[in-house]
Every structure is written in C-alpha cells, then in structure tokens.
Amino acid sequence: MDSKHQCVKLNDGHFMPVLGFGTYAPPEVPRSKALEVTKLAIEAGFRHIDSAHLYNNEEQVGLAIRSKIADGSVKREDIFYTSKLWSTFHRPELVRPALENSLKKAQLDYVDLYLIHSPMSLKPGEELSPTDENGKVIFDIVDLCTTWEAMEKCKDAGLAKSIGVSNFNRRQLEMILNKPGLKYKPVCNQVECHPYFNRSKLLDFCKSKDIVLVAYSALGSQRDKRWVDPNSPVLLEDPVLCALAKKHKRTPALIALRYQLQRGVVVLAKSYNEQRIRQNVQVFEFQLTAEDMKAIDGLDRNLHYFNSDSFASHPNYPYSDEY
C-alpha cells in the first residue's frame, strides 16, 4: 500500500504523510548513500522525506527527489520534504538566508516543512557546534519568539509551506503560542519518541493545541557513539516488542512504528538497509489491539537515547522540565 494516502491535516490546512523517511546518517557513512537510500525509499512508497542542515546531506536528498520526479515516479506535490533551521541561525536576520541555502543545496523551490531544529541557540558562524578553547560548546541567547517571526515570514514568502519546531518542551511551545501577534502556530513538534520514551504528556498537550507530534528515533536511534550511551538498552531487542512481532508475524521495528501511528503520532522510520526500508512501509497492513498498545505503553522508562550532556547547562535545555 502506498503510504502517501495516509496523511494528517495540519493546523494550517496542509497535509503531512503519517509515515516519513529519516535521512540522517553518522559522518562515517558516505554522503552518496543518502542519494541511494532516498531513491529506494520513494520507490518503496515513502512520500515524506526528512532532512536538515545539520545532516549535511541536503544536496543528495534533493537530487534523489528530483531524479524520481524526472523519471516520472512522482510529482513534486506528491513529496513532503522537511528541512530544519540549525541552532547557529536562530538570530532572526539569519533565518531566511539559512532556508534559502538549504533550498539551493536541494535545488528545490520550497520546502513543505521548515522546523526550528532545537530550542538551544548556538553562537553564529560556520561551525555546527562552536566550541571554546576548552572544548565547551558556545551558546547564544536569542529570543525564540523573534526566530519564530522570521519563520512566519518564510512561510509568507512561499519558501516553506508549513513551519514548526523540534525538540521543544511544553513551556517552549507555550512561549510561541502565547506570543503577542502570533500569525501561525507551529504545525508540529518533532521530538525523540519511542516505547522507552513515549512522551505521553507532551503528546496530550500537543493534541490539545492542534500541533502534531512527529517521532524521531522511533526505532531507538542508530546508536551513534557520539550521542548514545552504548550501555543503554536496545529498543528493538525488547522482549515485549519481540513477542508482539511474533504474534503479528512482523518485525519489532514495525511494531514500534505502528504503535506511534495508533497514538496519532507521525513517525519517521530511518533505515539505510534496502530490505528494511521496504519492510517499514508494511506498517499500514496490520493493527495492534488495545491490549498490545497497553503493553507497549508499559515500556516507558523516560530514556532518551540522545544524551546531550554538553547542552544540559543551556538555558533552553528542553529536558530540564518534566515535559
């Protein structure tokens, strides 16, 4: 079944496919691989493609999309393409140039969705992660409401069809929602979300504000050594997920993805393996029972794989609050 028929309506009237393809890969993976796997994903039925300035793959991902348009597989309007504003570009005058740069790299006229990648502003400049002589990350202090106003201007200019945020907590979302003169609400909040960190309170809050929660690391992350504790439990080896996979004759990954869809969460499936990319679109072919869902709900242990210790002292560190 083609996943493009399964969409959620955003608060600005646009539609987002509920299954997305995540394109991030650790630096040791050759960039050319992003081109190859994004093409495979589109061939398999993915229509929602998630990238970012941080991923350093927008040229390859854009080329993959354009090549599938050129060969007649899809039209541009069939594809929902997301990019993200990196933390070194939060100052309002840097927002539009950053988006224009992303569009230039992807060679696309617009993005379907542009997100503030993180609430934690960093010192502007070429470095993705600017550090001082002691190796400490250099923060910047920016009023994110001014960043948001610059995002709104990008939507008005037609450079982004929709705008949203990522890695925001409730307080940070409320700051935007309560901003005097708010023109557009964020359509979504893209956060780490999986059975070990199910974000149920944040999900309920987002639903109450007509903001879609989008899950990244829905399969428990790629366990990139730079971010993830190698001793943390491996989500897809969880006995409950494995038992449900056996029961439904599916993979544990499909159980984890289906869980999110049934909670009303848009889910990103990241894989650089052809067989698993094809498997992941089977998420629409089966259903979990209420008991299955309850069993998966019970796995929550408030475990975030992305261990941002170097950012814990940032005034906008999102995990300082309960949710």
From Swiss-Prot:
Q: Which GO terms describe its biological process?
A: cellular response to calcium ion; cellular response to corticosteroid stimulus; cellular response to jasmonic acid stimulus; cellular response to prostaglandin D stimulus; cellular response to prostaglandin stimulus; cellular response to starvation; daunorubicin metabolic process; doxorubicin metabolic process
Catalysed reaction per UniProt?
a 3alpha-hydroxysteroid + NADP(+) = a 3-oxosteroid + NADPH + H(+); a 3alpha-hydroxysteroid + NAD(+) = a 3-oxosteroid + NADH + H(+); prostaglandin F2alpha + NADP(+) = prostaglandin D2 + NADPH + H(+); prostaglandin F2alpha + NADP(+) = prostaglandin H2 + NADPH + H(+)
Q: Which Pfam families match?
A: Aldo_ket_red
**Which GO terms fall under molecular function for this chain's record?**
15-hydroxyprostaglandin-D dehydrogenase (NADP+) activity; 5-alpha-androstane-3-beta,17-beta-diol dehydrogenase (NADP+) activity; aldo-keto reductase (NADPH) activity; aldose reductase (NADPH) activity; all-trans-retinol dehydrogenase (NAD+) activity; all-trans-retinol dehydrogenase (NADP+) activity; androstan-3-alpha,17-beta-diol dehydrogenase (NAD+) activity; androsterone dehydrogenase [NAD(P)+] activity
Entry EC number(s): 1.1.1.-, 1.1.1.210, 1.1.1.53, 1.1.1.62
Pathway it works in: Steroid metabolism
What is the annotated tissue distribution of the protein whose record heads this document? Expressed in many tissues including adrenal gland, brain, kidney, liver, lung, mammary gland, placenta, small intestine, colon, spleen, prostate and testis. High expression in prostate and mammary gland. In the prostate, higher levels in epithelial cells than in stromal cells. In the brain, expressed in medulla, spinal cord, frontotemporal lobes, thalamus, subthalamic nuclei and amygdala. Weaker expression in the hippocampus, substantia nigra and caudate.
Positions of transmembrane segments: none
Single GO cellular component term: cytoplasm
Q: What is the effect of changing R226P?
A: Decreases in the retinaldehyde reductase activity. 3-fold decrease in the kcat value, whereas the KM value does not vary
Name the positions where NADP(+) binds: 23-24, 50, 166-167, 190, 216-222, 270-272, 276-280
Listed A to Z, the keywords are: Cytoplasm, Lipid metabolism, NAD, NADP, Oxidoreductase
The active site lies at Y55
- Cross-referenced Gene3D superfamilies: NADP-dependent oxidoreductase domain (3.20.20.100)
Which CDD domains does UniProt cross-reference here? AKR_AKR1C1-35
Please indicate which residues carry the site annotation Involved in ligand recognition and product release.
W227, F306
| UniProt-annotated location(s) | Cytoplasm
Q: Give the activity regulation note.
A: Strongly inhibited by nonsteroidal anti-inflammatory drugs (NSAID) including flufenamic acid and indomethacin. Also inhibited by the flavinoid, rutin, and by selective serotonin inhibitors (SSRIs). The oxidation reaction is inhibited by low micromolar concentrations of NADPH.
The UniProt function text for this chain reads:
Cytosolic aldo-keto reductase that catalyzes the NADH and NADPH-dependent reduction of ketosteroids to hydroxysteroids. Acts as a NAD(P)(H)-dependent 3-, 17- and 20-ketosteroid reductase on the steroid nucleus and side chain and regulates the metabolism of androgens, estrogens and progesterone. Displays the ability to catalyze both oxidation and reduction in vitro, but most probably acts as a reductase in vivo since the oxidase activity measured in vitro is inhibited by physiological concentration of NADPH.
Matching PANTHER family: ALDO/KETO REDUCTASE
Q: Which family does it belong to?
A: Belongs to the aldo/keto reductase family.
Q: What is this protein called in UniProt?
A: Aldo-keto reductase family 1 member C3
